[in-house]
Every structure is written in structure tokens, then in C-alpha cells.
């Protein structure tokens, strides 16, 4: 009997092991092109047990159910449900998806409840989506935000042209007013709301899906989605086994090598994904060399159908030379040829000892660690949580110091030029070491005593402005299905941020040391010989900060605590889907000034404004309310509407203005009200979407540094800025047949400032109040009503064609049009000219093109050849202007109707890249 029991136990164990090892495999392809779909989502219906397809469109999913239904969804394709039956513990499913539109129909990865991806003909928001395959094929040497330029109301530029220095505007709102999420985690800076794309230069390599929700968006969180939300979903650990190796080359020495591999999920539920890449070379602008590495590792564990966990770490340490300051059109022309501007010209560098040297250099490493947990409590309830941490370390370098000529005017290193427009570094160093220098009309005498010494006001040197941080947070979401059509979700959003802001010497340029008197708590003056490293630390757990003794000019830390509560009620039927969302948060701000002597007065003669080194936390509440509905009239027509109101806390520099530990006396939340109407039409081969929107934004705050009044450096703070952004958007796609497809979009906006705002001016040297020439007080009103919102094109259009002459070969061409592009708000001109109007930049057309050919071989392998050319016709155009100088009686010359004194960035000329990709 004992022996029989033994064998029965073994048999039972074997049967259980067999059941636990049941596997569903398959491939997901595009029905029309027959191309595999990377990142398609395969879900066992009724559960949260799902997986993403790999580069070959393959998936492998374990289950204990012999029968069931697979739900397959992917970007821009119709969701499909496929029944399966296991035979011998296995099933192989081949799925082809039909094109729907260029939008997302569903994304299911770990932490799905926190992604807030919009679904077509369901979520009532304006949305555009780019899939992983398009990102891989079209990125090349483009900047990540530029992949979105075919989206309505999006204006993306390379700005100065440095690696990762691009920026993006949506509906006229800049980076700080666009919420960017990675796997549901908000990445906007907690002090100023900005997104520094340099810190995320490698994110494109690990992105499986990117979705732009224009307007207030569908996110449940209290986030900065005034203009829109960019949702980024990264690679999942549980993609089936396989990988890819690729190499890309481009203009100006650009190169990129990448290797990625997925283990697939084993029988015990473990899976892993790893990616490594290196990018280097230079961009189109002169002396913009760079080197960036990227690493990604994800480890997944799904012990059963109820639980799924994934740990991810990714980072992109990099350094790059910049073209930071916009350059006058006059100088572009001066260093150009035959009356044409030198679009590559960069004024921020020169040769030092025969090697290139840039005053503007950016170095950063921002690793991010995330742990996601999905818990399927029952068929009607689920729980999702993500915890994250990041230790950002880095800086941007800049000029420091100056000389004084006989007239009392400051002469900066940037004024000492060679005949070809470069900074004369040899002359800079000779001056620092005691030699006199000649400038037009006079000689400037250097008197180092007893040795060459640099300060913030004399001598020439290079400094770094450190902007490092420690960032921790968590998000949690509970979702309960109340009935077949009604569901409710609620969650928490907690964050803590500590920002480190200070300056340190970077290169003494022949001086012996920097003499600093800024830290009032140390013996004065201090001799600082330390210089910061010019390359990033590769340690993802680096939490070091330079000691106070090595910090100069200023040193302040900003602490931000954030706690939010959010909820959503959603009703969905085949015809109607509607939602109501609310979120509330409390942000608490603290400022620590390491150089401040306790008791210093914020306002002269006002004892009640005495400051401490460390302020208490100032808590400010805020909230969001949103609602919307989509109605599917029939299979071809749908309409939607949404409305929302934000009461958003001011940014850190509005809470503690004027760079002081002095709380702003009248703190007011920014107020945003948005409303949107939309219509969609679709057939089997045609789809179009039309949107109308209006956003009112009140009580905005802006601070503008580095302004000049004659020979005095000052900065301005504007309070109470009001804006109206309204417009219309259209996007469409038409597939003629399997060989030809057209896509297009058009957007037109009217984005204007309203009424007056209050301006306050301060000296840059000591942050005291400053009265501008011609003014009687440091505080006065300025009229904004004649100005357009700048830095973004009010009108854009795009038309593209995709041609597939034969299987696996594709040609794409696109035309892009920009008009009603205005200069950014020129605060320096505004505070001096009450009748200022906006400078309109010339309209322009651009053409881009690309080809790709995929050669499959073996069972699972392929080689793909890629080539892309941007700005095919080498069009010369102005992408943005920092100044607002209109043509008037004092204008000496113009370029395309623009005063040549304006400081602008020209767009890149013709650029190209070619690539080779091997998938296995």
C-alpha cells in the first residue's frame, strides 16, 4: 500500500506539473503588410495575465486553463478575441490584426491601471500614438520629441541643437505644462515642472509605445497636463525569447550601437529583458560632440494568474557640448557665405591648446528604478502599485567672470573672438595670467596680485551649475467593477524630492584659484581650487554632493513633499462610455540656503523680513476635476466631449521668489479650465478625427533671468499672467490598398495673452529690488494683450505617403508646413516697451523621406536595412526666436523681413542616417 501511495503521489505531482507547464504560443502580425507587431498585448480574457509580443511578433503565455479566450490589442489596430484550446498542454495561435486608425486600442503591461492609455472610440480625449516599430525605424539621429511632429498642435524643435536639448510644445504650452509619464510614473521636475530630455536621451531605445493625449488628458493623477500628456510605455520583462542587434550611422560622425535580449518567461514565471546601447558623434551644429550610454534591465515574476511583479532599472549617462545661447541673425550672416547664414555656427566654443573647448557643456546621469506589482484580487477587482526612486546627478557649465574696460563696460570671454567667430581661448588664458588684452579702441590691463585669481566678476573661468536631486515616490490604484458597465477606482500618489542647486569651478583657464565670498557662514574670502569632473558618474546609486567648501556663488536645496488622492467612476457600454475624475493633492515646499547668514533681511529696513537658513514647509492644496463622454453613433461615427478644471499649485520659484528664503506674501494657485469637442469617422480603409478645444489659464508666474538694463544685470518676475488657447485639429489616414497609404493632419490655433500682469525687477548681483531706467518703482504693470503666445507654431500641417511596392520593402515621404510661428515672450523688451507686439517668423515647408527593407531568413531571424533623410531640400528656416525686435526706424538690415538683431535658432539643414538591424 505504501508503494502504491508513493506512485500515486508521483503521478499526481506529474499531472500538476504538466498542468502548470501548459503554454500558449503564437505570432501577431499586421493583416495588410504581414509585418510582425512589436509590443502587441496578448491577454487571457477575464484576467490581468498578459504578455507583450517581441520584435518578431511572437509571444509565449503559460496558463492552467485548457480553454479560454485571448484578447489581442495593439496601436492603431482593431482589438481581436481568439478562442484557444490546449492539446497536449500546448496551443499555437496565429493572429492578424486589421488597421483601425493611428491610435491605441489597448495596452496591457505590468502596472496597466496606472498607465492611463486612451482607447479609440472609448476614451473621450484627443489622442495620437506611435508604436515601437515606428520609433525603431524613424528615430535614427532625430531627437525623441521630434517623433511627434506629425501630431496636430505639436511643435518640436532641436532648440540649440545639442544632444538631448530638444523641446516640445503642445497647443502652445511648453514642457513644464505637459505631463510626461513613464509606465505611469510622472517625470516632470517637482520644482519647476520641466522635462529635461537630456536626462532621458536613451528612453527611445526602450520604448514600446508612446501616446500623446492633447488637452487635459485621461490621467487620474494631479499632474501638469495643461497642454497634454505624453505617456511612454517601456519594454516588458515578459516578452518572449529573442533579441536584436543594430547599428546606425549618420551625418557629422553620428553613430549608435544597440543590443537587446529577452529571455522569455520560464515555467516558474521568471523573465528578464536587457538592453545596452552607446551613441556618440556630433550633431549638425558646430562643436556639439557628445557621448551617451543607455542601459535597461527588467526582471519579471508571475507566480500565478493573480500576481505579476516587475523590477526595472534604466539610465542614460551622457555628456554633450551645447549651443546654448540663441545667436543674432547678423552673426549667422557674418560667418556665412554669399549672403546665406551659417546655420551650423556655434558661438559658445573655441580652441584651447589646439583642442576644442566649449563653455557650455552638459553632463548628467538620471537612473530610475521602478517596482511594479499587479494583483488580480478577483474577476471584478484588481490592485496595482508602483514604487520608484531616482538619483539624478549632473550640471550644465557656463561662463564666469569678466574684464572691465576704461569706460566701465564689462567685457566677457564671449566678446574675445577670432576672425572666424570662435572664442579666442588663448587670449582668454593669457589675460588670466597677467597679460593685457586689446579690444576695439583700447587695451584692458590685467593686474593679478599676487597670482592670477578668478571671481564671479573678474577674470575669466568656467563654472558648473549643479541641478542634482534625490526623488522617491509611489503610486497605487484599486479598481472595482461595480456592475457589468460600471467601475470605480481610487488611488494614492506620494512623492518626495530633494533638489541640490549650487555652482562650482569647472576650468580655471590659467587662474590659480577662484576667490569666493558668497558663503556668509565661512571665513571670507575663500580660495577654491577644486574643479568639477567633465564626465558623468556611471554609478546608478551615486548620492554624493560636493562639500560646501567647494561650492561657489550660491548653494540652496529645495525640498518638495507631495501627497495626492485620486478617484474615477467609469461607465461603459457598446455605445456610450463616460467618466468622472477627481484628484486632490497637497504640495509642501521648503527652501534651504546654505550660504545665508541667519537674520539677513529679505527687504532692506524691514526687520520682519529676517530670514533663516532653513524655512519651514509651506503646504499648498490643489485639485483637478474632469469629466467626459464618448458616444458611438454607429460603426462609422462617434462624438465625444470633455471638460475639466485644475487648481494647480505654483512652482517652487513662485513660492520662494527672488532667490530668497522669504515666502511670497500672496500665493495664488494657477487656474486652468478646458473644454473639448471631438468627432471621429472610420471605415475599413479611411479614418479621420476632428477636435475643437479651448483652454483658459489664469494667474501664471514667469521668472526671466539674465536681463540687461544698460550695463546692469537684473531679472524679472511676472505674476498674474492670463492666457487663452483655442483651436481646431484634424488628422486622417487613408489606405488605398496594400501598397499605398496616406496620412495627414492640420491644426490651427489662436493662443493669446490677456490683459495686464505685474512685473517685479531685481538686481542679479544681490537679489535686491532694482528700478529700471525710465521707471519710478521696481514693481509695475505690463500690458500683454497685444501679444501672441510664442515658441510654438499656431498652424501646422503634414501630409505623408507610405508606399510598399513589394513585400518587406517600404518607402515613406512626408511634407511638413509651419506658419503663424511667433517669437517667445521677450520679457526684457516687454518691461521697456508698453506697446510691444509679437514678432512673427517666416513660414516654412520641410520634406522628409525614408526607406526600409526587411530580409527574413530561417524560422525567426531577419535583417532590416534603414535609411532616412530629414529636410530633403536643405531648406533654410528659423525654428525659434528668443527676442522680439520688430523692424522700425532703427533697423539697419533685415533677413526675410526680420530685423537681423534678433537672436534665433535656425533649423538643421539636410541630415541623414542609415541603419542595419538584426533580429533573432
Predicted regions and their residues:
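Gram-negative outer-membrane beta-barrel transporters
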Residues: 572-575, 694-696, 717-827, 917-919
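Acidic/polar loop-and-plug regions of large Gram-negative outer-membrane beta-barrel proteins
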Residues: 300, 308-372, 395-464, 528-549, ...
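Short acidic/polar hinge/loop motifs at secondary-structure boundaries
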Residues: 60-62, 167, 186-214
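A beta-strand signature from Gram-negative outer-membrane beta-barrel systems
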Residues: 93-95, 201-246
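Surface-exposed extracellular loop regions of Gram-negative outer-membrane beta-barrel proteins
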Residues: 327, 534-545, 588-609, 617, ...
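Transmembrane beta-barrel wall of Gram-negative outer-membrane proteins
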Residues: 242-244, 249-280, 285-323, 368-380, ...
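C-terminal beta-signal and adjacent terminal beta-strands/loops
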Residues: 741-742, 818-826, 854-920
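Short, acidic, small-residue-rich periplasmic hinge/interaction motif at the N-terminus
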Residues: 29-33, 40-45, 71-77, 87-137, ...
Amino acid at each position: 500500500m505504501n508503494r502504491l501511495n508513493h506512485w500515486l503521489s508521483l503521478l499526481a505531482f506529474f499531472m500538476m506539473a504538466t498542468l502548470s507547464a501548459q503554454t500558449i504560443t503564437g505570432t501577431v502580425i499586421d493583416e495588410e503588410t504581414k509585418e510582425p507587431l512589436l509590443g502587441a498585448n496578448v491577454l487571457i480574457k477575464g484576467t490581468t495575465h498578459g504578455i507583450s509580443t517581441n520584435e518578431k511578433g511572437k509571444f509565449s503565455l503559460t496558463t492552467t486553463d485548457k480553454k479560454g479566450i485571448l484578447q489581442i490589442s495593439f496601436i492603431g489596430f482593431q482589438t481581436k478575441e481568439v478562442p484557444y484550446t490546449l492539446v497536449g498542454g500546448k496551443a499555437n495561435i496565429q493572429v492578424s490584426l486589421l488597421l483601425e486608425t493611428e491610435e491605441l486600442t489597448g495596452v496591457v503591461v505590468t502596472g496597466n491601471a496606472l498607465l492611463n492609455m486612451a482607447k479609440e472610440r472609448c476614451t473621450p480625449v484627443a489622442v495620437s500614438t506611435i508604436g515601437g516599430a515606428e520609433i525603431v525605424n524613424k528615430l535614427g539621429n532625430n531627437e525623441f520629441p521630434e517623433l511627434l511632429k506629425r501630431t496636430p498642435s505639436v511643435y518640436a524643435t532641436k532648440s540649440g541643437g545639442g544632444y538631448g536639448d530638444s523641446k516640445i510644445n503642445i497647443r502652445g504650452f511648453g514642457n513644464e505644462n505637459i505631463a510626461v509619464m513613464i509606465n505611469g510614473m510622472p517625470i516632470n521636475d517637482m520644482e519647476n515642472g520641466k522635462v529635461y530630455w537630456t536626462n532621458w536621451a536613451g528612453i527611445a531605445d526602450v520604448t514600446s509605445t508612446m501616446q500623446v493625449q492633447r488637452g487635459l488628458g485621461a490621467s487620474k493623477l494631479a499632474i501638469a497636463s495643461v497642454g497634454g500628456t505624453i505617456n511612454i510605455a517601456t519594454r516588458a520583462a515578459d516578452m518572449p525569447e529573442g533579441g536584436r542587434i543594430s547599428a546606425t550611422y549618420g551625418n557629422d560622425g553620428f553613430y549608435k550601437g544597440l543590443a537587446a535580449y529577452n529571455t522569455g518567461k520560464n515555467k516558474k514565471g521568471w523573465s528578464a529583458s536587457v538592453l545596452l546601447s552607446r551613441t556618440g558623434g556630433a550633431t549638425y551644429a558646430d562643436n556639439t560632440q557628445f557621448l551617451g550610454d543607455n542601459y535597461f534591465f527588467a526582471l519579471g515574476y508571475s507566480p500565478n494568474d493573480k500576481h505579476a511583479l516587475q523590477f526595472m532599472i534604466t539610465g542614460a549617462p551622457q555628456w554633450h557640448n551645447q549651443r546654448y545661447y540663441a545667436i543674432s541673425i547678423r552673426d549667422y550672416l557674418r560667418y556665412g557665405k554669399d549672403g546665406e547664414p551659417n546655420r551650423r555656427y556655434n558661438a559658445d566654443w573655441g580652441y584651447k591648446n589646439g583642442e576644442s573647448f566649449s563653455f557650455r557643456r552638459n553632463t548628467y546621469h538620471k537612473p530610475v528604478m521602478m517596482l511594479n506589482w499587479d494583483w488580480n484580487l478577483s474577476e471584478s477587482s484588481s490592485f496595482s502599485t508602483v514604487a520608484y526612486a531616482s538619483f539624478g546627478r549632473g550640471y550644465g557649465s557656463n561662463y564666469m567672470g569678466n574684464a572691465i574696460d576704461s569706460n566701465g563696460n564689462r567685457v566677457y570671454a564671449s566678446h574675445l573672438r577670432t576672425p572666424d567667430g570662435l572664442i579666442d581661448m588663448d587670449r582668454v588664458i593669457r589675460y588670466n595670467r597677467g597679460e593685457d588684452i586689446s579690444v576695439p579702441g583700447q587695451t584692458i590691463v590685467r593686474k593679478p596680485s599676487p597670482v592670477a585669481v578668478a571671481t564671479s566678476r573678474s577674470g575669466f573661468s568656467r563654472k558648473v551649475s549643479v541641478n542634482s536631486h534625490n526623488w522617491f515616490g509611489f503610486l497605487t490604484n484599486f479598481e472595482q467593477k461595480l456592475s457589468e458597465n460600471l467601475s470605480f477606482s481610487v488611488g494614492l500618489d506620494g512623492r518626495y524630492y530633494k533638489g541640490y542647486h549650487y555652482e562650482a569651478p569647472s576650468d580655471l583657464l590659467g587662474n590659480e584659484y577662484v576667490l569666493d565670498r558668497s558663503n556668509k557662514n565661512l571665513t571670507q574670502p575663500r580660495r577654491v581650487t577644486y574643479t568639477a569632473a567633465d564626465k558623468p558618474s556611471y554609478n546608478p546609486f551615486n548620492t554624493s554632493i560636493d562639500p560646501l567648501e567647494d561650492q561657489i556663488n550660491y548653494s540652496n536645496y529645495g525640498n518638495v513633499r507631495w501627497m495626492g488622492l485620486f478617484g474615477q467612476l467609469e461607465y461603459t457600454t457598446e455605445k456610450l462610455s463616460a467618466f468622472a475624475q477627481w484628484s486632490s493633492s497637497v504640495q509642501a515646499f521648503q527652501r534651504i540656503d546654505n550660504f545665508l547668514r541667519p537674520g539677513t533681511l529679505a527687504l532692506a529696513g524691514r526687520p520682519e523680513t529676517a530670514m533663516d537658513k532653513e524655512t519651514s514647509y509651506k503646504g499648498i492644496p490643489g485639485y483637478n476635476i474632469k469629466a467626459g463622454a464618448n458616444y458611438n453613433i454607429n460603426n462609422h461615427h462617434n462624438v465625444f466631449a470633455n471638460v475639466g478644471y485644475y487648481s494647480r499649485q505654483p512652482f517652487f520659484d513662485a513660492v520662494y521668489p527672488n532667490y530668497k528664503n522669504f515666502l511670497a506674501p500672496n500665493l495664488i494657485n494657477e487656474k486652468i479650465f478646458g473644454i473639448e469637442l471631438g468627432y471621429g469617422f472610420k471605415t475599413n480603409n479611411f479614418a479621420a478625427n476632428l477636435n475643437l478645444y479651448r483652454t483658459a489659464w489664469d494667474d501664471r508666474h514667469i521668472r526671466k533671468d539674465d536681463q540687461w538694463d544698460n550695463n546692469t544685470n537684473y531679472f524679472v518676475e511676472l505674476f498674474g499672467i492670463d492666457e487663452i488657447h483655442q483651436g481646431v485639429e484634424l488628422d486622417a489616414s487613408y489606405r488605398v490598398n496594400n501598397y499605398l497609404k496616406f496620412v495627414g493632419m492640420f491644426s490651427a490655433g489662436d493662443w493669446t495673452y490677456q490683459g495686464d500682469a505685474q512685473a517685479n525687477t531685481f538686481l542679479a548681483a544681490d537679489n535686491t529690488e532694482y528700478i529700471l531706467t525710465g521707471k519710478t518703482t521696481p514693481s509695475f504693470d505690463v500690458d500683454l494683450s497685444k501679444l501672441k503666445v510664442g515658441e510654438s507654431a499656431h498652424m501646422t500641417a503634414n501630409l505623408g505617403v507610405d508606399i510598399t511596392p513589394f513585400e518587406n520593402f517600404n518607402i515613406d515621404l512626408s511634407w511638413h508646413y509651419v506658419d503663424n510661428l511667433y517669437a517667445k515672450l521677450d520679457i526684457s523688451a516687454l518691461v521697456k516697451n508698453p506697446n510691444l507686439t509679437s514678432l512673427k517668423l517666416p513660414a516654412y515647408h520641410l520634406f522628409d523621406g525614408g526607406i526600409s527593407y526587411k530580409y527574413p531568413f530561417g524560422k525567426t531571424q531577419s535583417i532590416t536595412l534603414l535609411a532616412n533623410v530629414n529636410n530633403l531640400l536643405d531648406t533654410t528656416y528659423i525654428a525659434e526666436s528668443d527676442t522680439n525686435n520688430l523692424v522700425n526706424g532703427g533697423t539697419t538690415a533685415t533677413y526675410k523681413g526680420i530685423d537681423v538683431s534678433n537672436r534665433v535658432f535656425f533649423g538643421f539643414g539636410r541630415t541623414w542616417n542609415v541603419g542595419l538591424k538584426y533580429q533573432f
